[in-house]
């Protein structure tokens, strides 16, 4: 969700040229996702993240688009849910890797020990074990997130 719309759109030509291509659709509670984007300053080209209404529409566009592509290429697109990964990391990661025809390794659970460079907004987070505090984080600010709760029909 944190990229331009073209970045989250699988290309039909690519899917035809590389029929075994795997797309990972990583989903998270929409309010947590949108609020996380809103409070993160992104570089050029991410102006939609400065407005909660724009972020909400962008998120919905992503869901509609990926669901469309999933209808065309159901075996290529795997949806993984953030909250489920946090609750059952080994099981969910194994299912994802199985979909990608990749063997599970214990290092998948120890990703935070890697010393590889990371150039994303989550560069500090990937240096820590998975944590549950991001689940329903939006509720701490629910009084200021009426736009999001309305878009996604959530009660405070």
Model-predicted regions and their roles:
Residues 1, 37-79, 86-156:
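PAPS-dependent sulfotransferases, especially Golgi type II membrane carbohydrate sulfotransferases
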Residues 5-8, 29-32, 40, 83-87:
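Short, solvent-exposed loop/turn segments at secondary-structure junctions
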Residues 17-39, 96:
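Conserved phosphate-donor/acceptor-positioning beta-strand/loop module used by diverse small-molecule
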């Amino acid at each position: 969700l944190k990229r331009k719309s073209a970045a989250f759109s699988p290309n039909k030509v690519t899917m035809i040229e590389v029929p075994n291509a795997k797309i990972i659709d990583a989903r998270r509670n929409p309010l947590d996702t949108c609020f996380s984007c809103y409070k993160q300053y992104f570089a050029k080209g991410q102006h939609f993240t400065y407005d909660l209404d724009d972020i909400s529409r962008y998120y919905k566009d992503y869901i509609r688009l990926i669901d469309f592509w999933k209808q065309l290429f159901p075996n290529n697109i795997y949806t993984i849910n953030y909250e489920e990964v946090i609750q059952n990391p080994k099981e969910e990661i194994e299912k994802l890797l199985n979909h990608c025809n990749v063997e599970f390794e214990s290092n998948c659970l120890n990703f935070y020990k890697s010393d590889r460079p990371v150039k994303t907004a989550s560069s500090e987070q990937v240096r820590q074990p998975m944590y549950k505090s991001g689940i329903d984080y939006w509720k701490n600010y629910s009084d200021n997130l009426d736009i999001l709760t309305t878009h996604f029909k959530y009660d405070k």
